[in-house]
């Protein structure tokens, strides 16, 4: 032992990690015995000091932090601001939840950090401070709950409760806080009990897998190894230090030409430092993966003993050590949650703060605007971003790492300690993520609207589930619905105002028809004439109510006369249109067939190219029976069917197609089909012949006579009855036995005598085989259908629609609804449509409009003189261009506009179903103007819809409008009603509610952007009027502060002395505005509540109250556009990723999933494609046999390494370090089984048998032939039940089954493992028992050698004796 004078004296606090290092160095220098003596002295000293101190804990020792009060008030203030932002629609529910969690978590963490300095300054000898911060008893989390704040709690499902406990246990809890605390404490107790048992069971299974693995040899002679690259910068030093130290080299290591380490040399600290200093080549080491022994491991493949620092001894039970090394930390780490009582734990992002005041500068081209997880605007940098902060002559540079958020703008002035960036969490910390669904419930009863197009969720094709493609607001417009049994038509129109006092003239029902999901909800006002004294309604205190009839637009039935059958009924957004007719007979016929023609509008109002716009089901192509369709020609074109295409998501386009046959004829082969349950009692046999009305089951009778065919399909029985004649063919007939064929009309021989018979119709000959020698041909009747020519189809549709030739093309096409040879099964009492006549929408694909991807369909509703007309508008639109406001542009920051800027209209197409085009002078009738904006500067179109329901498109040439004479015609009030498209509802923005009248022949000047030049000068020549809902006419003065812009149908506000170049807030009718938005630029302007603008008058704006809900892309929307939602209904569902709690109890299930080989994450869609690409490349480089061999080898090795890394990530995230050797032994066992395939190994093993991988390779080498097997990844439970010892299997699980199978198979247990020897009371083959076994085997071998030697001596002696005798 060294002299005391040579020892150094250290006076510092020592932790657990430092004690481990000290003990390791003591063992190296002094050995095991003297080290234990030193540690005993340390232990005795510790107990002596603890006894002398005699610390006791009282309630007065719990000192609360002085700064707690203002910290809690600051957190509450931040949450109040967050709540307002959420109410304004600037932050959605998930962002609000995240920010709320981080606010309270940061406050709680600040308390935790302040505890130690507070105790150190105020009371350094406080018992709580001494015990907890020295590690003697308790930890910082428990003391934090005693003197800080209890904080956020978890509910029984593990989710965070949004209400934090602000009190600590010293102050006492309120009733609400106590209940929330009990939630978390109960969860903590249950989790502790359950997860401790889970960890124990995991340890048992791990030991079960590897209990037989013992060190039995010194060297297995393998030349394989795993390469470790010491120059890998992505791997931290601690990781590959642990990977290399204690291993054995599989190959020599050279530095230049000098060998610095040889094969089979173990790596110590000194050799490892040489590798680190010299930066050598990749190092090949031996691992348990590379050992060639089947049931045990050699010393060199295992490496150094973890306890003694030299090569492991023979007989060491390394398998049990490995199982306990992995399982025991899980058991211990569950104890971490014992006393924290379910307190929620999480992490926050690391922040970068400015060191001093200054102006910040960075390269704007390297960042991209985005939103943080809290909903704040920020910039995302993909690479290292260099940010400089300038303050006079001082320049400070900061490097922002990739994937971080920059929270400030370029050239912005920042203050000292201001947060300028948030850095992503460390790359090597393993955070568990789980997908969480967050439902947002409506807190207002009313009508749903959204301000962007939404997509149908593909898995819910016809439901009310939609998916948002981009960030937008969802609105709930306030309104109440009174469900009543009676429904009556109203004489009022949509959006009309009505006075309650006007209802007192008699009994009258005024209904609010709200159509959604084919249900009608309405508001009912009921007055009884007998109650004349009480002229008030107690339920409705508001004087003026607005009727909202949604998109169905019911009008008074007296107006429609006998054409009310043409009213559209919503049927998955398909709408009925009437025919063209000239006479009463044609009109009556059209009314009968009106239900057959439908216009199909998608939910979001968007058409793709070659979409079906309208279709007509002709009754002559209908059938009541099931059957098969056959085409006469096979010329197939594809046509897009909107019902069948899958919505395109970002980066994914997937379409399904229907067949459209360019055929004149097709065939239908009728048959009777029944699908019966498997247990049905069928009264007919297969291949039997039945007559009409023959009972098939108890409740079913046959409708036709013919041959019965039975077939079983997926637990059901399919019964078909084929009508026709049976024909027994001769040997020379040329009908194929394996197929059926159509035979055209022709003359055939009836019998061998030569008589002939002429077939008039087509027949279908089908070969029926009963047995191998019994067969016949069934001749079935065929129905021939001829498809009408295109010219005959045009009469069904309006000529105006087909004559549009500018950009849009409408084609009339027939297509067959089923494929060639497809069977059609009908439903009882319903007809099957075979051919559909459709109108296909297309547009020119030229260079100018190459970006056009969609057509936007909308309906324009106009009401003139009490008549409602609907016009269909199809506007070609370019793909969505997200508008991002410039960062330095102050406009738009105070006002939220609607989504009109997203659309780029290109020559919209208007069509109207009228008998003839009518022209009428503008001077005689006032007309309603609807302006169309074109991108073509030379031609601008005005569409003028006059009160006589005729329309006319005029053009502006060079920005001027010229007067033309038009011939007036007589008006027929019934024509517009019969020829209107009907009340068609569609999911669109709210239509403009006011009407604009234009009486002018003066010039209108328009600039290039479609705006009005010189607003005041332009409006002086406009003679326009405003009609409000009460039909009062206003004529605004030019000097007023409101102007009408007819090009956008918006309103401009400005003042008398304002500059013309000044930007004005714009109000659109139907526009949504958020709360606290100022729409008038003047002092003391009112701040409005959120809602939708309904009316704009001279001195007031009418706003319907509404609540906005912000939603992000991918959010699921529940409900249709315009649907009525009650308070508390699910509005949207957010799917977001949340970090799990920070203890091992959340990680253990992941470890168990890996070890039991259950899928953790979703499998990549392109996995099969990637594997195929890899195999192709390797085969191309190395050739076919070597390519597949190396691919298989690399797959096995890489899967093993990947499993080891997955398990290590879980434990390293908790600060637990387990040596890779232990995990490698476990993974070696669960990846060492192969499944024998049916090809090749029938001589040695049975197909489907599980054998060891090394055993299969040895069998292949001994047989000198290729062996086919498939490598399996078995879980630890299945591996324990597939060992060489049936005694070990029976003692683990399913004892009776294992022993029964072992007895039937005659299995032999060689008692090589520990467990089977313990069960039978034998000597365990480990430790000292292993030496006895080795001694016995040597003694047995010696006895065998001596016996053989004696035999040979006797034989020699006898032979010599016989030779002498001879």
From Swiss-Prot:
Q: Which SUPFAM superfamilies match?
A: beta and beta-prime subunits of DNA dependent RNA-polymerase (SSF64484)
Say yes or no: keyword Zinc present. Answer: yes
Identify a single GO molecular function assigned to this protein: DNA-directed RNA polymerase activity
Main location group: plastid
Q: Which residues bind Zn(2+)?
A: 220, 291, 298, 301
Gene Ontology terms: biological process: DNA-templated transcription
Explain how, and how many, cofactor molecules are bound. Answer: Binds 1 Zn(2+) ion per subunit.
Q: What Pfam families is this protein classified in?
A: RNA_pol_Rpb1_4, RNA_pol_Rpb1_5
| UniProt keyword list | Chloroplast, DNA-directed RNA polymerase, Metal-binding, Nucleotidyltransferase, Plastid, Transcription, Transferase, Zinc
Q: Where in the cell is it found?
A: Plastid, Chloroplast
Highest taxon above the source species: Eukaryota
- Reaction equation(s) it catalyzes: RNA(n) + a ribonucleoside 5'-triphosphate = RNA(n+1) + diphosphate
**EC top class, in one word?**
transferase
Q: Which cofactor does it need?
A: Zn(2+)
Name the family.
Belongs to the RNA polymerase beta' chain family. RpoC2 subfamily.
What binding partners and quaternary form does the record give?
A: In plastids the minimal PEP RNA polymerase catalytic core is composed of four subunits: alpha, beta, beta', and beta''. When a (nuclear-encoded) sigma factor is associated with the core the holoenzyme is formed, which can initiate transcription.
Q: What is this protein called?
A: DNA-directed RNA polymerase subunit beta''
* Naturally occurring in which organism (per UniProt): Phaseolus vulgaris
